[in-house]
């Protein structure tokens, strides 16, 4: 099974950045790819998603989410709830193993296959194998520096890559 992803989203004021590392790991010991892109812009560039979990599953869910965004006119929360409901109820989708972070100019959401759509209390959220490390680093940087969201997200992933063996420092960042 493919694994090993770290995604972090950081919001400050009217800016949000979502960053992901580039490592794809097969099993527990083989790195297959160093430069995978796990961050995508959807809905005419107005929404950023980052995904963690099985690569094929994450891509499938990202495509489904894009369909929901189109169906609901770019309404992030509505599209997320509809995706989560379909994900939980559909016999095939229910078996997919992935998490999504989705962000637009107003909201940041975590979407899971168990039907949860969570808006974090803090303006930072992390997922994947190094997600907790990246989230902790991003929170510290957000509250103790004047760095912008892109710099915070990038530095948080750099820190996570020094701790988590499934995370590398080939980082992609998208900002709204």
From Swiss-Prot:
Its EC number is 3.4.25.2. GO terms for biological process: proteolysis involved in protein catabolic process. Gene3D superfamilies: Glutamine Phosphoribosylpyrophosphate, subunit 1, domain 1. It holds the Pfam family Proteasome. One of its GO terms (molecular function) is metal ion binding. Keywords: Allosteric enzyme, Cytoplasm, Hydrolase, Metal-binding, Protease, Sodium, Threonine protease. One of its GO terms (cellular component) is proteasome core complex. It comes from the Bacteria. It catalyses: ATP-dependent cleavage of peptide bonds with broad specificity. The active site is at residue 5. It is found in: Cytoplasm. InterPro entries: ATP-dep_Prtase_HsIV_su (IPR022281), Ntn_hydrolases_N (IPR029055), Proteasome_sua/b (IPR001353), Proteasome_suB-type (IPR023333). Na(+) binds at residues 161, 164, 167. Allosterically activated by HslU binding. It is an enzyme of class 3 (hydrolase). A double ring-shaped homohexamer of HslV is capped on each side by a ring-shaped HslU homohexamer. The assembly of the HslU/HslV complex is dependent on binding of ATP. Belongs to the peptidase T1B family. HslV subfamily. Protease subunit of a proteasome-like degradation complex believed to be a general protein degrading machinery. PANTHER family: ATP-DEPENDENT PROTEASE SUBUNIT HSLV (PTHR32194:SF0), METALLOPROTEASE TLDD (PTHR32194). This is ATP-dependent protease subunit HslV. The lineage of its organism: Bacteria, Bacillati, Bacillota, Clostridia, Thermoanaerobacterales.
